[in-house]
Amino acid sequence: AADTATTHRLLAPSHARLAAHDDAIVRAQITVAQIAAPTGEETERGGWVSRRYRDYGLDDIHTDDAGNVIGRRPGIADLEPVVICAHLDTVFPRETDLSIRRQGDRLVGPGINDNGRGIAVMLALASEIDGSRVRSRRPIEFVATTGEEGVGDLKGAKHYFAKRGRNAHATIALDGAGDERIIHRALGSRRFRISYSGPGGHSWAAFGAPNAVHAAAGAAARLAALSLPSVPRTTLSVGRIGGGLSVNSIPDSAWLEIDLRSTSSNHLDDFERVIRRIAQIAADEENAKRSLGTRMLTVSIESIGARPCGETSPDHQLVQSAIEATRLVGRHPDLALASTDANVPISQGIPAIAIGAGGRGGDAHTHAEWFDNVHGTIGVARALTIVMAAAGVA
């Protein structure tokens, strides 16, 4: 923490320059939010980020096989890099109206906060850590990641940290607004699609054939009745269910999708086994009721998402530095749990946190999403101090 305080003082001229460019950072935020980037379709937004990397003179600018846009600022020493990442993708379909409008002090529109803010501030830091006014001891890699949201399943982060970033010294993910939260605990999740398939038929003439919807409903009912631990907190939800052709048909297929979350990898393992067992029990029960000579119902289980969990210890230097940097800008540190790009390095033992990039925001993942740049410069200064405390001021 003492090193963080020293770093913060040394960076005072940088904090002043970034504050002077506050309007430009917000303009970049508006620009990036208006470039469509649905999960899996981040190419156009990634290209815009790549051009900004070139404008700022980063080295080794490239797009990897997962679509991550990477740029590097060399350090004065040949050491493992500090990684700054911000996700490119949004939850909004391509056809969404991405216009950003002002409502009083707020900017309102899809993606203006999550993650237009994170991308804009990552680029502002890339511009300020220019190798002359501000130089770092360690190299710093700037990574605009793909597939952070929903079905993206942390695709970009998983690819980057499995390969190029596997030896990173530390990682700071910039995600949305805020200047107090320090996400050092990674909420893990597993998602499954259970599918039932049977012969189907007419609701009268084929009565007695196993009913795929009955099996799916039976599985959902059993899952809903499970007793889940509060410590470590574990949640399970049947998020979607469907099947059948018409009201007067015995469905030949049905499916349900399940979201399982926990802070414990052991609990994720345990409840995955429970889910698989219940899926089979529901099929067995429906088959036990079928008429002689009818084809049996079958069940399949597909994994449609897996986000790892873990924790960077609150006593670790990176977390302590983030706590001190938050206090140095006059804010109150809030140690938190969430699912972010930082899940991946945390699960691999790489020290990592996710933080907000300044200002205030709300209504994420809706068309009413908003950002208010109140004290936005404070969050930018905090982010720079945390990054440079990890990388070392040269």
Question: How would you label these PLM feature ranges?
Answer:
Residues 106, 111, 115-187, 229, ...:
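Acidic/histidine-rich catalytic neighborhood of metal-dependent amide-processing enzymes
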Residues 24, 50, 54, 62, ...:
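Active-site metal-coordination/substrate-binding segment of hydrolases
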Residues 1-13, 34, 212-394:
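Metal-dependent amide/peptide-bond hydrolase catalytic core
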Residues 88-102, 168, 184-195, 324, ...:
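Acidic-glycine-rich active-site phosphate/pyrophosphate-binding loop
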Residues 1-35, 186-188:
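N-terminal hydrophobic or amphipathic helices/low-complexity stretches enriched
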Residues 98-111, 197-201, 327, 363-367:
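Glycine/charged-rich beta-loop-alpha catalytic/anionic-binding loops adjacent to active sites
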Residues 28-31, 35-80:
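A non-catalytic alpha/beta surface segment that caps or lines the substrate-entry region
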